[in-house]
Protein backbone atom coordinates (compact mmCIF):
# COMPACT_ATOMS: atom_id res chain seq x y z
CA UNK A 1 0.00 0.00 0.00
CA UNK A 2 1.28 3.45 -0.85
CA UNK A 3 2.33 5.81 1.93
CA UNK A 4 -0.49 8.23 1.06
CA UNK A 5 -3.07 5.47 1.53
CA UNK A 6 -1.75 4.72 5.03
CA UNK A 7 -1.98 8.44 5.73
CA UNK A 8 -5.65 8.30 4.79
CA UNK A 9 -6.21 5.39 7.18
CA UNK A 10 -4.43 7.30 9.97
CA UNK A 11 -6.54 10.39 9.26
CA UNK A 12 -9.73 8.29 9.44
CA UNK A 13 -8.88 6.82 12.85
CA UNK A 14 -7.71 10.20 14.16
CA UNK A 15 -11.24 11.46 13.53
CA UNK A 16 -13.32 8.34 14.28
CA UNK A 17 -12.89 5.86 17.11
CA UNK A 18 -13.82 2.21 16.68
CA UNK A 19 -16.55 2.54 19.34
CA UNK A 20 -17.95 5.92 18.24
CA UNK A 21 -21.29 4.34 17.27
CA UNK A 22 -21.91 3.30 20.88
CA UNK A 23 -20.77 6.56 22.49
CA UNK A 24 -22.63 8.89 20.09
CA UNK A 25 -25.81 6.84 20.42
CA UNK A 26 -25.59 6.87 24.24
CA UNK A 27 -24.92 10.64 24.24
CA UNK A 28 -28.06 11.18 22.15
CA UNK A 29 -30.01 8.97 24.56
CA UNK A 30 -28.86 11.04 27.55
CA UNK A 31 -29.21 14.47 25.89
CA UNK A 32 -32.52 14.00 24.06
CA UNK A 33 -34.29 10.68 24.36
CA UNK A 34 -34.66 10.48 28.15
CA UNK A 35 -36.48 13.83 28.17
CA UNK A 36 -38.63 12.74 25.19
CA UNK A 37 -39.64 9.52 26.99
CA UNK A 38 -40.66 11.49 30.09
CA UNK A 39 -42.55 14.12 28.04
CA UNK A 40 -44.47 11.53 26.00
CA UNK A 41 -45.26 9.13 28.85
CA UNK A 42 -48.86 8.81 30.00
CA UNK A 43 -49.88 11.45 32.57
CA UNK A 44 -50.00 10.34 36.21
CA UNK A 45 -53.59 10.85 37.35
CA UNK A 46 -54.89 9.76 40.74
CA UNK A 47 -58.41 8.40 41.12
CA UNK A 48 -58.83 9.84 44.61
CA UNK A 49 -58.86 13.58 45.22
CA UNK A 50 -58.57 14.46 41.50
CA UNK A 51 -54.80 14.94 41.66
CA UNK A 52 -52.40 14.99 38.70
CA UNK A 53 -48.61 14.69 38.80
CA UNK A 54 -46.90 16.97 36.29
CA UNK A 55 -43.30 16.34 35.21
CA UNK A 56 -40.74 18.86 33.98
CA UNK A 57 -37.07 18.80 33.07
CA UNK A 58 -34.76 15.91 33.90
CA UNK A 59 -31.25 16.62 35.23
CA UNK A 60 -28.40 14.10 35.00
CA UNK A 61 -25.26 14.78 37.05
CA UNK A 62 -21.82 13.31 36.51
CA UNK A 63 -21.03 10.30 38.74
CA UNK A 64 -20.38 10.96 42.42
CA UNK A 65 -20.42 8.87 45.58
CA UNK A 66 -21.88 9.64 49.00
CA UNK A 67 -19.60 8.38 51.75
CA UNK A 68 -20.68 7.07 55.18
CA UNK A 69 -19.95 10.47 56.79
CA UNK A 70 -22.33 12.20 54.33
CA UNK A 71 -19.63 13.82 52.18
CA UNK A 72 -19.89 13.72 48.39
CA UNK A 73 -16.99 13.21 45.99
CA UNK A 74 -16.40 12.40 42.33
CA UNK A 75 -16.05 8.73 41.49
CA UNK A 76 -13.91 7.53 38.58
CA UNK A 77 -14.22 4.15 36.80
CA UNK A 78 -11.11 2.69 38.47
CA UNK A 79 -12.55 3.34 41.94
CA UNK A 80 -15.87 1.74 40.91
CA UNK A 81 -13.99 -1.38 39.76
CA UNK A 82 -11.95 -1.62 42.96
CA UNK A 83 -14.81 -0.92 45.39
CA UNK A 84 -17.34 -3.25 43.73
CA UNK A 85 -19.62 -0.33 42.77
CA UNK A 86 -21.74 0.66 39.79
CA UNK A 87 -20.45 3.64 37.81
CA UNK A 88 -23.69 5.60 37.61
CA UNK A 89 -25.13 9.11 37.43
CA UNK A 90 -27.66 10.75 39.75
CA UNK A 91 -30.97 11.57 37.96
CA UNK A 92 -33.40 14.21 39.21
CA UNK A 93 -36.77 15.15 37.72
CA UNK A 94 -38.86 18.25 38.26
CA UNK A 95 -42.30 17.22 39.59
CA UNK A 96 -45.33 18.87 41.11
CA UNK A 97 -48.70 17.68 42.38
CA UNK A 98 -51.70 19.56 40.98
CA UNK A 99 -55.19 19.38 42.46
CA UNK A 100 -58.19 20.06 40.26
CA UNK A 101 -59.44 23.57 41.04
CA UNK A 102 -56.46 24.26 43.30
CA UNK A 103 -53.65 26.78 42.83
CA UNK A 104 -50.50 25.84 40.91
CA UNK A 105 -47.53 24.80 43.03
CA UNK A 106 -43.82 25.15 42.26
CA UNK A 107 -41.83 22.32 40.68
CA UNK A 108 -39.53 20.45 43.07
CA UNK A 109 -36.50 18.36 42.12
CA UNK A 110 -36.98 14.70 42.99
CA UNK A 111 -34.28 12.02 42.86
CA UNK A 112 -35.71 9.32 40.56
CA UNK A 113 -32.78 6.92 40.26
CA UNK A 114 -29.26 6.13 39.10
CA UNK A 115 -28.34 5.82 35.42
CA UNK A 116 -25.40 3.51 34.53
CA UNK A 117 -22.81 5.66 32.75
CA UNK A 118 -21.00 4.61 29.58
CA UNK A 119 -17.25 5.22 29.80
CA UNK A 120 -16.00 8.16 27.68
CA UNK A 121 -19.56 9.45 27.13
CA UNK A 122 -20.41 13.12 27.78
CA UNK A 123 -21.51 12.45 31.38
CA UNK A 124 -18.38 10.41 32.19
CA UNK A 125 -15.51 12.08 34.10
CA UNK A 126 -13.06 10.60 31.54
CA UNK A 127 -14.67 12.51 28.65
CA UNK A 128 -12.16 14.86 27.03
CA UNK A 129 -9.18 13.88 29.24
CA UNK A 130 -5.71 13.65 27.67
CA UNK A 131 -3.26 10.75 27.86
CA UNK A 132 -1.43 11.92 31.01
CA UNK A 133 -4.69 12.75 32.81
CA UNK A 134 -6.09 9.28 32.03
CA UNK A 135 -2.95 7.61 33.41
CA UNK A 136 -3.23 9.77 36.55
CA UNK A 137 -6.83 8.51 37.03
CA UNK A 138 -5.68 4.89 36.73
CA UNK A 139 -7.04 4.35 33.21
CA UNK A 140 -5.42 2.82 30.14
CA UNK A 141 -5.05 5.71 27.64
CA UNK A 142 -5.58 3.25 24.77
CA UNK A 143 -8.95 2.12 26.18
CA UNK A 144 -11.71 3.52 23.95
CA UNK A 145 -14.61 3.23 26.42
CA UNK A 146 -18.12 2.47 25.18
CA UNK A 147 -18.96 0.01 27.98
CA UNK A 148 -20.48 0.12 31.50
CA UNK A 149 -19.25 -0.83 34.98
CA UNK A 150 -22.01 -2.56 36.97
CA UNK A 151 -21.11 -4.11 40.35
CA UNK A 152 -17.43 -3.82 39.35
CA UNK A 153 -18.00 -5.91 36.17
CA UNK A 154 -17.35 -4.40 32.75
CA UNK A 155 -20.43 -4.93 30.57
CA UNK A 156 -20.76 -4.16 26.87
CA UNK A 157 -24.07 -3.75 25.03
CA UNK A 158 -23.80 -5.57 21.70
CA UNK A 159 -25.21 -4.13 18.49
CA UNK A 160 -28.43 -5.92 17.50
CA UNK A 161 -29.30 -6.61 13.85
CA UNK A 162 -33.01 -6.38 13.02
CA UNK A 163 -35.34 -6.25 10.03
CA UNK A 164 -35.92 -2.62 8.97
CA UNK A 165 -38.95 -1.20 10.80
CA UNK A 166 -41.92 0.53 9.11
CA UNK A 167 -41.05 -1.09 5.79
CA UNK A 168 -43.05 -3.62 3.75
CA UNK A 169 -41.19 -6.93 3.33
CA UNK A 170 -42.65 -9.38 0.78
CA UNK A 171 -41.91 -13.11 0.90
CA UNK A 172 -43.14 -16.39 -0.57
CA UNK A 173 -44.13 -19.09 1.91
CA UNK A 174 -44.93 -22.79 1.68
CA UNK A 175 -43.96 -25.10 -1.19
CA UNK A 176 -42.83 -23.68 -4.54
CA UNK A 177 -45.95 -24.88 -6.36
CA UNK A 178 -48.23 -23.32 -3.72
CA UNK A 179 -49.59 -19.87 -4.43
CA UNK A 180 -48.86 -18.45 -0.99
CA UNK A 181 -47.16 -15.21 -0.05
CA UNK A 182 -46.93 -12.83 2.87
CA UNK A 183 -46.31 -9.11 3.39
CA UNK A 184 -44.89 -8.13 6.78
CA UNK A 185 -44.43 -4.73 8.42
CA UNK A 186 -42.76 -4.24 11.79
CA UNK A 187 -44.44 -0.99 12.80
CA UNK A 188 -42.65 0.92 15.57
CA UNK A 189 -43.80 4.01 17.45
CA UNK A 190 -42.55 5.27 20.84
CA UNK A 191 -40.96 1.94 21.71
CA UNK A 192 -44.06 -0.15 20.89
CA UNK A 193 -43.47 -2.79 18.19
CA UNK A 194 -46.43 -4.17 16.24
CA UNK A 195 -45.91 -6.94 13.69
CA UNK A 196 -48.56 -6.74 10.96
CA UNK A 197 -48.76 -9.79 8.67
CA UNK A 198 -50.91 -9.84 5.51
CA UNK A 199 -51.14 -13.28 3.88
CA UNK A 200 -52.52 -14.56 0.57
CA UNK A 201 -53.51 -18.21 0.37
CA UNK A 202 -56.21 -20.19 -1.39
CA UNK A 203 -59.20 -20.85 0.88
CA UNK A 204 -59.87 -24.48 1.79
CA UNK A 205 -63.66 -24.23 1.55
CA UNK A 206 -65.63 -21.00 1.61
CA UNK A 207 -63.00 -18.69 3.06
CA UNK A 208 -61.14 -15.59 1.95
CA UNK A 209 -57.88 -15.23 0.02
CA UNK A 210 -56.51 -12.24 1.98
CA UNK A 211 -56.07 -12.43 5.75
CA UNK A 212 -54.37 -10.06 8.16
CA UNK A 213 -53.09 -10.43 11.72
CA UNK A 214 -51.88 -7.78 14.16
CA UNK A 215 -51.45 -7.46 17.97
CA UNK A 216 -54.37 -7.94 20.37
CA UNK A 217 -56.61 -9.56 17.73
CA UNK A 218 -56.93 -13.35 18.13
CA UNK A 219 -56.30 -15.28 14.90
CA UNK A 220 -56.62 -13.68 11.47
CA UNK A 221 -59.13 -11.17 10.12
CA UNK A 222 -60.44 -11.01 6.54
CA UNK A 223 -58.64 -7.99 5.05
CA UNK A 224 -61.74 -6.48 3.42
CA UNK A 225 -63.58 -6.38 6.77
CA UNK A 226 -60.68 -4.45 8.28
CA UNK A 227 -60.64 -2.06 5.29
CA UNK A 228 -64.34 -1.38 5.85
CA UNK A 229 -63.75 -0.71 9.54
CA UNK A 230 -61.04 1.78 8.56
CA UNK A 231 -63.42 3.78 6.38
CA UNK A 232 -63.48 2.17 2.91
CA UNK A 233 -67.18 1.45 3.26
CA UNK A 234 -68.35 0.48 -0.23
CA UNK A 235 -67.28 -2.45 -2.40
CA UNK A 236 -66.17 -0.03 -5.12
CA UNK A 237 -63.90 1.91 -2.75
CA UNK A 238 -62.20 -1.29 -1.57
CA UNK A 239 -61.68 -2.66 -5.10
CA UNK A 240 -60.32 0.57 -6.63
CA UNK A 241 -58.05 1.33 -3.67
CA UNK A 242 -56.39 -2.09 -3.97
CA UNK A 243 -55.57 -1.97 -7.69
CA UNK A 244 -56.49 -0.82 -11.20
CA UNK A 245 -55.65 -4.31 -12.52
CA UNK A 246 -58.81 -6.31 -13.34
CA UNK A 247 -57.36 -9.66 -12.16
CA UNK A 248 -56.44 -8.26 -8.75
CA UNK A 249 -59.81 -6.56 -8.48
CA UNK A 250 -61.54 -9.92 -9.06
CA UNK A 251 -59.65 -11.47 -6.12
CA UNK A 252 -60.78 -8.56 -3.94
CA UNK A 253 -64.36 -8.93 -5.26
CA UNK A 254 -64.42 -12.63 -4.27
CA UNK A 255 -63.26 -11.74 -0.76
CA UNK A 256 -65.85 -8.96 -0.52
CA UNK A 257 -68.68 -11.38 -1.27
CA UNK A 258 -67.54 -13.85 1.40
CA UNK A 259 -66.98 -11.08 3.96
CA UNK A 260 -70.48 -9.67 3.41
CA UNK A 261 -71.88 -13.04 4.51
CA UNK A 262 -69.69 -12.93 7.63
CA UNK A 263 -70.98 -9.46 8.58
CA UNK A 264 -74.63 -10.68 8.49
CA UNK A 265 -75.96 -7.42 7.04
CA UNK A 266 -79.66 -6.54 6.87
CA UNK A 267 -79.90 -5.97 3.09
CA UNK A 268 -83.60 -5.02 3.09
CA UNK A 269 -83.05 -2.39 5.77
CA UNK A 270 -80.09 -0.96 3.83
CA UNK A 271 -82.06 -0.65 0.59
CA UNK A 272 -85.38 0.59 1.94
CA UNK A 273 -84.62 2.68 5.03
CA UNK A 274 -81.14 4.16 4.53
CA UNK A 275 -79.68 6.88 2.34
CA UNK A 276 -76.13 6.62 0.99
CA UNK A 277 -74.44 8.20 4.04
CA UNK A 278 -76.41 6.01 6.47
CA UNK A 279 -75.44 2.91 4.47
CA UNK A 280 -71.77 3.90 4.74
CA UNK A 281 -72.05 4.32 8.51
CA UNK A 282 -73.92 1.01 8.81
CA UNK A 283 -71.24 -0.89 6.84
CA UNK A 284 -68.37 0.65 8.84
CA UNK A 285 -70.12 -0.01 12.16
CA UNK A 286 -70.88 -3.63 11.17
CA UNK A 287 -67.20 -4.22 10.35
CA UNK A 288 -66.12 -2.69 13.67
CA UNK A 289 -68.67 -4.88 15.52
CA UNK A 290 -67.22 -7.97 13.77
CA UNK A 291 -63.73 -7.06 15.04
CA UNK A 292 -65.20 -6.25 18.47
CA UNK A 293 -66.62 -9.78 18.68
CA UNK A 294 -63.03 -11.04 18.31
CA UNK A 295 -61.28 -8.70 20.74
CA UNK A 296 -63.97 -8.45 23.46
CA UNK A 297 -66.15 -11.51 23.09
CA UNK A 298 -69.02 -11.74 25.56
CA UNK A 299 -68.95 -8.05 26.53
CA UNK A 300 -71.67 -5.45 25.89
CA UNK A 301 -72.03 -4.12 22.34
CA UNK A 302 -70.85 -0.60 23.22
CA UNK A 303 -67.75 -1.96 24.95
CA UNK A 304 -66.99 -4.30 22.01
CA UNK A 305 -67.16 -1.38 19.55
CA UNK A 306 -65.04 0.88 21.77
CA UNK A 307 -62.44 -1.87 22.29
CA UNK A 308 -62.29 -2.64 18.55
CA UNK A 309 -61.73 1.04 17.71
CA UNK A 310 -59.05 1.28 20.40
CA UNK A 311 -57.20 -1.78 19.03
CA UNK A 312 -57.37 -0.45 15.45
CA UNK A 313 -56.09 2.98 16.45
CA UNK A 314 -53.32 1.90 18.83
CA UNK A 315 -52.02 -1.43 17.53
CA UNK A 316 -52.58 -1.39 13.75
CA UNK A 317 -49.69 0.36 11.96
CA UNK A 318 -48.89 2.67 14.93
CA UNK A 319 -46.10 4.37 12.95
CA UNK A 320 -48.77 6.01 10.75
CA UNK A 321 -50.55 7.38 13.82
CA UNK A 322 -52.73 6.41 16.75
CA UNK A 323 -55.53 8.95 16.26
CA UNK A 324 -58.95 8.06 14.75
CA UNK A 325 -58.39 10.48 11.85
CA UNK A 326 -55.50 8.26 10.64
CA UNK A 327 -57.75 5.28 9.87
CA UNK A 328 -58.26 6.12 6.19
CA UNK A 329 -54.50 6.59 5.77
CA UNK A 330 -53.99 3.12 7.27
CA UNK A 331 -56.58 1.69 4.85
CA UNK A 332 -54.73 3.17 1.85
CA UNK A 333 -51.41 1.77 3.18
CA UNK A 334 -52.93 -1.73 3.55
CA UNK A 335 -54.47 -1.51 0.08
CA UNK A 336 -51.06 -0.66 -1.42
CA UNK A 337 -49.54 -3.52 0.58
CA UNK A 338 -52.20 -5.85 -0.87
CA UNK A 339 -51.42 -4.91 -4.47
CA UNK A 340 -47.71 -5.56 -3.88
CA UNK A 341 -48.58 -8.97 -2.40
CA UNK A 342 -50.78 -9.90 -5.37
CA UNK A 343 -47.98 -8.85 -7.74
CA UNK A 344 -45.68 -11.35 -6.00
CA UNK A 345 -48.31 -14.09 -6.44
CA UNK A 346 -48.69 -13.30 -10.16
CA UNK A 347 -44.93 -13.08 -10.74
CA UNK A 348 -44.96 -9.38 -11.66
CA UNK A 349 -42.88 -8.49 -8.63
CA UNK A 350 -40.03 -10.39 -6.99
CA UNK A 351 -40.22 -11.10 -3.24
CA UNK A 352 -37.75 -9.20 -1.07
CA UNK A 353 -34.41 -10.66 -0.04
CA UNK A 354 -34.61 -10.41 3.76
CA UNK A 355 -30.83 -10.80 4.03
CA UNK A 356 -30.15 -7.80 1.77
CA UNK A 357 -28.61 -5.12 4.00
CA UNK A 358 -31.08 -2.53 2.69
CA UNK A 359 -33.70 -4.46 4.67
CA UNK A 360 -31.65 -4.51 7.89
CA UNK A 361 -31.10 -1.96 10.65
CA UNK A 362 -28.59 -1.98 13.50
CA UNK A 363 -29.69 -1.01 17.00
CA UNK A 364 -26.83 0.26 19.16
CA UNK A 365 -26.48 1.22 22.83
CA UNK A 366 -28.67 4.33 22.81
CA UNK A 367 -31.55 2.58 21.03
CA UNK A 368 -31.49 -0.38 23.41
CA UNK A 369 -31.13 1.84 26.50
CA UNK A 370 -34.14 3.83 25.26
CA UNK A 371 -36.30 0.67 25.25
CA UNK A 372 -35.06 -0.23 28.72
CA UNK A 373 -35.55 3.25 30.20
CA UNK A 374 -39.10 3.54 28.84
CA UNK A 375 -40.16 0.35 30.64
CA UNK A 376 -38.24 1.28 33.82
CA UNK A 377 -39.80 4.77 33.92
CA UNK A 378 -43.29 3.27 33.47
CA UNK A 379 -42.60 0.99 36.47
CA UNK A 380 -41.52 4.04 38.48
CA UNK A 381 -44.68 6.04 37.66
CA UNK A 382 -46.93 3.08 38.48
CA UNK A 383 -45.23 2.57 41.83
CA UNK A 384 -45.43 6.30 42.56
CA UNK A 385 -49.13 6.41 41.63
CA UNK A 386 -49.85 3.45 43.94
CA UNK A 387 -48.02 5.07 46.88
CA UNK A 388 -49.82 8.41 46.38
CA UNK A 389 -53.21 6.64 46.21
CA UNK A 390 -52.36 4.82 49.44
CA UNK A 391 -51.45 8.10 51.18
CA UNK A 392 -54.76 9.66 50.11
CA UNK A 393 -56.71 6.59 51.28
CA UNK A 394 -55.11 6.96 54.73
CA UNK A 395 -56.09 10.63 54.87
CA UNK A 396 -52.49 11.88 54.63
CA UNK A 397 -51.29 14.85 52.60
CA UNK A 398 -49.72 13.38 49.42
CA UNK A 399 -46.05 14.18 48.76
CA UNK A 400 -44.30 13.46 45.46
CA UNK A 401 -40.88 13.30 47.12
CA UNK A 402 -42.01 10.64 49.60
CA UNK A 403 -43.89 8.68 46.92
CA UNK A 404 -40.87 8.20 44.62
CA UNK A 405 -38.72 5.14 45.34
CA UNK A 406 -35.56 5.77 43.33
CA UNK A 407 -34.46 2.12 43.61
CA UNK A 408 -37.34 1.06 41.28
CA UNK A 409 -35.76 2.76 38.26
CA UNK A 410 -32.17 2.10 39.35
CA UNK A 411 -32.67 -1.64 39.86
CA UNK A 412 -34.51 -2.09 36.56
CA UNK A 413 -31.65 -0.46 34.64
CA UNK A 414 -28.85 -2.09 36.63
CA UNK A 415 -30.35 -5.60 36.57
CA UNK A 416 -30.82 -5.58 32.78
CA UNK A 417 -27.24 -4.45 32.08
CA UNK A 418 -25.81 -6.83 34.71
CA UNK A 419 -27.64 -9.91 33.37
CA UNK A 420 -28.22 -9.09 29.68
CA UNK A 421 -31.94 -9.89 30.04
CA UNK A 422 -33.64 -7.04 28.19
CA UNK A 423 -37.22 -5.88 27.77
CA UNK A 424 -39.22 -7.83 25.20
CA UNK A 425 -37.84 -11.17 26.42
CA UNK A 426 -34.45 -10.76 24.73
CA UNK A 427 -31.39 -12.29 26.39
CA UNK A 428 -27.68 -11.66 25.91
CA UNK A 429 -28.09 -7.98 24.96
CA UNK A 430 -25.30 -6.99 27.35
CA UNK A 431 -22.25 -9.21 27.80
CA UNK A 432 -19.18 -9.39 30.01
CA UNK A 433 -16.49 -7.42 28.16
CA UNK A 434 -13.83 -9.64 26.59
CA UNK A 435 -10.48 -8.70 28.18
CA UNK A 436 -8.51 -11.66 26.80
CA UNK A 437 -6.49 -9.21 24.71
CA UNK A 438 -6.70 -5.62 23.46
CA UNK A 439 -7.73 -6.85 20.00
CA UNK A 440 -10.37 -9.08 21.61
CA UNK A 441 -11.83 -6.08 23.43
CA UNK A 442 -12.04 -3.98 20.24
CA UNK A 443 -13.60 -6.92 18.40
CA UNK A 444 -16.22 -7.34 21.13
CA UNK A 445 -17.15 -3.64 20.99
CA UNK A 446 -17.87 -3.95 17.23
CA UNK A 447 -19.86 -7.17 17.43
CA UNK A 448 -23.20 -7.44 15.61
CA UNK A 449 -25.68 -10.09 16.78
CA UNK A 450 -28.68 -11.49 14.91
CA UNK A 451 -31.77 -12.36 17.01
CA UNK A 452 -32.41 -15.59 15.04
CA UNK A 453 -32.45 -18.90 16.91
CA UNK A 454 -29.10 -20.72 17.06
CA UNK A 455 -30.85 -24.12 17.00
CA UNK A 456 -32.36 -23.58 13.51
CA UNK A 457 -30.40 -23.93 10.23
CA UNK A 458 -31.14 -20.43 8.77
CA UNK A 459 -28.71 -21.20 5.93
CA UNK A 460 -29.38 -17.99 3.98
CA UNK A 461 -29.13 -15.78 7.09
CA UNK A 462 -25.76 -17.33 7.98
CA UNK A 463 -24.32 -16.95 4.48
CA UNK A 464 -22.15 -14.00 3.54
CA UNK A 465 -24.32 -11.61 1.51
CA UNK A 466 -22.83 -9.41 -1.27
CA UNK A 467 -24.45 -6.30 0.26
CA UNK A 468 -22.38 -6.80 3.43
CA UNK A 469 -19.26 -5.75 1.48
CA UNK A 470 -17.55 -2.89 3.31
CA UNK A 471 -20.01 -3.10 6.18
CA UNK A 472 -19.49 -6.53 7.78
CA UNK A 473 -16.16 -8.35 8.13
CA UNK A 474 -16.32 -11.41 5.80
CA UNK A 475 -13.92 -13.41 7.95
CA UNK A 476 -14.63 -12.72 11.62
CA UNK A 477 -17.45 -14.96 12.82
CA UNK A 478 -17.23 -17.78 15.37
CA UNK A 479 -17.51 -21.48 14.67
CA UNK A 480 -20.27 -23.44 16.43
CA UNK A 481 -24.03 -22.65 16.26
CA UNK A 482 -23.25 -18.90 16.30
CA UNK A 483 -21.56 -19.09 12.89
CA UNK A 484 -22.92 -16.37 10.59
CA UNK A 485 -25.32 -15.07 13.24
CA UNK A 486 -22.63 -13.32 15.29
CA UNK A 487 -20.74 -10.94 13.03
CA UNK A 488 -18.42 -7.95 13.32
CA UNK A 489 -18.45 -4.54 11.70
CA UNK A 490 -15.78 -4.00 9.05
CA UNK A 491 -12.80 -2.02 10.32
CA UNK A 492 -13.74 1.29 8.66
CA UNK A 493 -17.52 0.83 8.68
CA UNK A 494 -19.59 3.60 10.27
CA UNK A 495 -23.22 3.38 11.37
CA UNK A 496 -25.33 6.27 10.11
CA UNK A 497 -28.09 7.72 12.27
CA UNK A 498 -31.77 7.54 11.44
CA UNK A 499 -33.79 10.71 10.87
CA UNK A 500 -37.26 11.65 12.05
CA UNK A 501 -39.58 11.23 9.01
CA UNK A 502 -41.83 14.05 10.28
CA UNK A 503 -38.89 16.48 10.22
CA UNK A 504 -37.92 15.36 6.69
CA UNK A 505 -41.51 15.81 5.51
CA UNK A 506 -41.58 19.32 7.01
CA UNK A 507 -38.38 20.30 5.16
CA UNK A 508 -39.74 18.89 1.88
CA UNK A 509 -42.97 20.87 2.36
CA UNK A 510 -41.00 24.10 2.94
CA UNK A 511 -39.08 23.45 -0.28
CA UNK A 512 -42.41 23.25 -2.12
CA UNK A 513 -41.89 19.66 -3.30
CA UNK A 514 -45.17 18.39 -1.75
CA UNK A 515 -48.29 20.18 -0.54
Swiss-Prot record:
Principal place of residence: cytoplasm
Record bears the keyword S-adenosyl-L-methionine: no
Family matches, as SUPFAM superfamilies: beta and beta-prime subunits of DNA dependent RNA-polymerase
Entry keyword DNA-binding: yes
EC numbers for this chain: 2.7.7.6
Superkingdom classification of source: Archaea
Pfam families: RNA_pol_Rpb2_1 (PF04563), RNA_pol_Rpb2_2 (PF04561), RNA_pol_Rpb2_3 (PF04565)
Keyword annotations: Cytoplasm, DNA-binding, DNA-directed RNA polymerase, Nucleotidyltransferase, Transcription, Transferase
Recorded GO MF terms: DNA binding; DNA-directed RNA polymerase activity; ribonucleoside binding
GO cellular component: cytoplasm; DNA-directed RNA polymerase complex
One Gene Ontology term from the biological process aspect of the record: DNA-templated transcription
Annotated InterPro entries: DNA-dir_RNA_pol_su2, RNA_pol_bsu_protrusion, RNA_pol_Rpb2_2, RNA_pol_Rpb2_2_sf, RNA_pol_Rpb2_3
Catalytic activity: RNA(n) + a ribonucleoside 5'-triphosphate = RNA(n+1) + diphosphate
Localization (cell): Cytoplasm
Family that this chain belongs to: Belongs to the RNA polymerase beta chain family.
Subunit record text: Part of the RNA polymerase complex.
Function as written in the Swiss-Prot or TrEMBL entry: DNA-dependent RNA polymerase (RNAP) catalyzes the transcription of DNA into RNA using the four ribonucleoside triphosphates as substrates. The Rpo2 subunit (Rpo2N and Rpo2C in this organism) is implicated in DNA promoter recognition and in nucleotide binding.
Name of the protein in its database record: DNA-directed RNA polymerase subunit Rpo2N
Originating organism: Methanothermobacter thermautotrophicus (strain Winter) (Methanobacterium thermoautotrophicum)
Gene this protein is translated from: rpo2N
Amino acid sequence: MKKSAWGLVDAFFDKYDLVDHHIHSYNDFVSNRIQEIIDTSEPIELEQGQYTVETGKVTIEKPFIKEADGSKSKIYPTEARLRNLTYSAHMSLEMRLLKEGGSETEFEKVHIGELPVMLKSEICHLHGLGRDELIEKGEDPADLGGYFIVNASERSIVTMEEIAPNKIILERIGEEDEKRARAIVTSIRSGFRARISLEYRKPRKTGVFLRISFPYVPGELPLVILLRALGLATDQEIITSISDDFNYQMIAADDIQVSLDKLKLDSDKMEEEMDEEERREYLIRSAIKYIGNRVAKGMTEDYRIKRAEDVIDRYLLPHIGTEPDKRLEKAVYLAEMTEMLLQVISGERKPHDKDHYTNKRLRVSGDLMEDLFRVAFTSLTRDMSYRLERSLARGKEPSVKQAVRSDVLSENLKHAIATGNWVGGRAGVSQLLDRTSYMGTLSHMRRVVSPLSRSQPHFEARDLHPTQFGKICPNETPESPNCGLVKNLALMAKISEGSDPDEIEEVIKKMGVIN
